[in-house]
Amino acid sequence: MNITKIDWQKVNGLLPVIIQNISTREVLMLGYMNEEALTKTIKERKVTFFSRTKQRLWTKGEISGNFLNVEEMSLDCDNDTLLILVDPIGATCHTGEYSCFHQFTSPQSENKKQQFANWAWFIKLEQHLKEKKNADPSNSYTATLHAKGTKKIAQKVGEEGVETALAAVAQDKAEVISEATDLVYHLTVLLHNQDLQWYEIIAKLQERHQGIGLHPEGGNK
């Protein structure tokens, strides 16, 4: 991104900045930056705004610890609005809500918001499990699985897959949820064992579902 393209005169010295979660794509907040705030944000890789009420620079999370870690930045086509993709720590809104945009008008929107929050949590869980790959096996079940190798992990995936299927045949929804949870956990460990992550699986799903009615195995059914 070429920050020299920003038309500071057009925005009266304050650039509107949209903050978006890089993983879930949920819009988290809107703030404003002057040139000093933008320079500080780029240098420190943590979002810093210019507070119009306090008339000073304000790093998001400087009090709460809920920083917005910068991952990507992009100007819009008119060079007068900035989009920042972030990896947020904790809630973004001062009310404790995950996003400042949480006052939806319909139950469907509220459900969508919760889905975003759940997905964000899963991404954090995957990162946590990935970090356990090289941890001390004596203190971590995940590390123990990695220490035992691919065959052991694959065996666990197979076992949990069968148990999930049996629970479904028995029409036991609570057991399906329990076994599917174990299956997803062990499958995540297996992906990390193979130096893969869930985003690669999701990308393949997106590739296979480009057309309406596209079958997961690649054929149209």
Curated annotation (Swiss-Prot):
Q: Where is this region: Phosphoribosyl-ATP pyrophosphohydrolase?
A: 122-221
The record, for Pfam families, names:
PRA-CH, PRA-PH
Q: Sorted alphabetically, which keywords does the UniProt record give?
A: Amino-acid biosynthesis, ATP-binding, Cytoplasm, Histidine biosynthesis, Hydrolase, Multifunctional enzyme, Nucleotide-binding
Residue span of region Phosphoribosyl-AMP cyclohydrolase? 1-121
Q: Which GO terms describe its cellular component?
A: cytoplasm
Main subcellular location? cytoplasm
Which GO annotations describe the biological process of this protein?
Answer: L-histidine biosynthetic process
Q: Which residues cross the membrane?
A: none
Pathway-wise, it operates in: Amino-acid biosynthesis; L-histidine biosynthesis; L-histidine from 5-phospho-alpha-D-ribose 1-diphosphate: step 2/9; Amino-acid biosynthesis; L-histidine biosynthesis; L-histidine from 5-phospho-alpha-D-ribose 1-diphosphate: step 3/9
Q: Report the InterPro entries cross-referenced here.
A: His_synth_HisIE (IPR023019), HisE (IPR008179), PRib-ATP_PPHydrolase-like (IPR021130), PRib_AMP_CycHydrolase_dom (IPR002496), PRib_AMP_CycHydrolase_sf (IPR038019)
Name the catalysed reactions.
Answer: 1-(5-phospho-beta-D-ribosyl)-ATP + H2O = 1-(5-phospho-beta-D-ribosyl)-5'-AMP + diphosphate + H(+); 1-(5-phospho-beta-D-ribosyl)-5'-AMP + H2O = 1-(5-phospho-beta-D-ribosyl)-5-[(5-phospho-beta-D-ribosylamino)methylideneamino]imidazole-4-carboxamide
Q: Which family does it belong to?
A: In the N-terminal section; belongs to the PRA-CH family. In the C-terminal section; belongs to the PRA-PH family.
NCBIfam families, alphabetically?
histidine_hisI, PRK00051.1, PRK02759.1
Name of the molecule in the record:
Histidine biosynthesis bifunctional protein HisIE
Biological source species: Haemophilus influenzae (strain ATCC 51907 / DSM 11121 / KW20 / Rd)
